[in-house]
Amino acid sequence: MQQRQSILWGAVATLMWAGLAHAGEASPVDPLRPVVDASIQPLLKEHRIPGMAVAVLKDGKAHYFNYGVANRESGAGVSEQTLFEIGSVSKTLTATLGAYAVVKGAMQLDDKASRHAPWLKGSAFDSITMGELATYSAGGLPLQFPEEVDSSEKMRAYYRQWAPVYSPGSHRQYSNPSIGLFGHLAASSLKQPFAPLMEQTLLPGLGMHHTYVNVPKQAMASYAYGYSKEDKPIRVNPGMLADEAYGIKTSSADLLRFVKANIGGVDDKALQQAISLTHQGHYSVGGMTQGLGWESYAYPVTEQTLLAGNSAKVILEANPTAAPRESGSQVLFNKTGSTNGFGAYVAFVPARGIGIVMLANRNYPIEARIKAAHAILAQLAG
């Protein structure tokens, strides 16, 4: 009897040990975690960020690192499926949609904007191209619409009366009304409204099945709350051409799929050509070269150069344009994005096969995002 009990307990112990060993194998520590934690943990503390989803691409493999909460009230944790507002990172998808319209023959970047909107005939947009709208070089359109422009009728009236401050193409003035109009007219050239075209054609083609302009009821539980400077839960408000300029909500997993598509391509030939078109430089401002949506730098790139290209001077002021710089075979593409309650950053280097997505539910300084991402990418490239 005693021998049988010894055998039984031995068998149980063996099974328990095997189970523990198997559990250990199922969740090994990601070798990149110390690298990511070293940059992200101090960021969360310093800027009181409730939650952040970081996704990293290296050697074709996705790595996910999630921190904090998506909703302070419910305590729901952040995951790679949590939906964040990505603000102006949306512009890279709007640009891809516009490039897709070009590839499909619905429009050309050299087309005058009024060609695709009869209501613009006789305005300054008879002399401004679609490409200039896409690259913020229409001649000084402002960062935002004036507050009183709160309807489609007022929006059309605003564009019809607007007069350029600079010759089209001569200056970059970062502008939601500029790329917003580009996205609106690009969708019109394909005979569809922007949001359905984005959600039903472009996003599925990119494999982004958990990305939305308008978050549907069944996905609302995944939609994080942003937090204001006063720590109040907030989400983006509707606005004129908000969908086109800063309206996308997505997860770190989906946004990394977009990065992967920009690095390795997609099966859809037209969509692949569109992605390639967004990478082409139109002009340079300092060390930054402006593509469609994406902004690029010769790689390797210093932290200082990245900070300069994403500085308040570049974002808020008009800057003279120069011929696009020759960047060689290695290029870093990046884009920042913010809403009142969210802060995003995306960067990738196709030649190295590395990329990073950082999504937070607080709008924290762009400088801090750049420094953290640059440090992580440097380790990935090493």
Curated annotation (Swiss-Prot):
The active site is at residue 88. InterPro entries: Bact_CellWall_Synth/Modif, Beta-lactam-related, Beta-lactam/transpept-like, Beta-lactam_class-C_AS. Keywords: Antibiotic resistance, Hydrolase, Metal-binding, Nucleotide-binding, Plasmid, Signal, Zinc. GO terms for biological process: antibiotic catabolic process; response to antibiotic. AMP binds at residues 88, 174, 338. Pfam families: Beta-lactamase. One of its GO terms (cellular component) is outer membrane-bounded periplasmic space. Inhibited by various nucleotides in vitro, including adenosine 5'-(P-acetyl)monophosphate (acAMP), inosine-5'-monophosphate (IMP) and guanosine-5'-monophosphate (GMP); IMP and GMP exhibit strongest competitive inhibition. Inhibited by the beta-lactamase-blocking agent, avibactam. Inhibited by clavulanic acid. Weakly inhibited by citric acid. Its EC number is 3.5.2.6. One of its GO terms (molecular function) is nucleotide binding. Coiled coil: none annotated. GMP binds at residues 88, 144, 174, 336, 338, 363. It catalyses: a beta-lactam + H2O = a substituted beta-amino acid. Residues 1-23 form the signal peptide. Gene3D superfamilies: DD-peptidase/beta-lactamase superfamily. IMP binds at residues 88, 144, 174, 336, 338, 363. The class C beta-lactamase family has a specific amino-acid numbering system known as SANC, for structural alignment-based numbering of class C beta-lactamases, or else the simpler name structural position. A multiple sequence alignment was used to derive a consensus sequence and then the consensus was numbered taking into account insertions and deletions. This allows use of identical numbers, e.g. for active site residues, despite differences in protein length. Monomer. Belongs to the class-C beta-lactamase family. Class C beta-lactamase which confers resistance to penicillins and cephalosporins. Has benzylpenicillin-, ceftazidime-, nitrocefin- and imipenem-hydrolyzing activity. This is Beta-lactamase CMY-10. It comes from Klebsiella aerogenes.
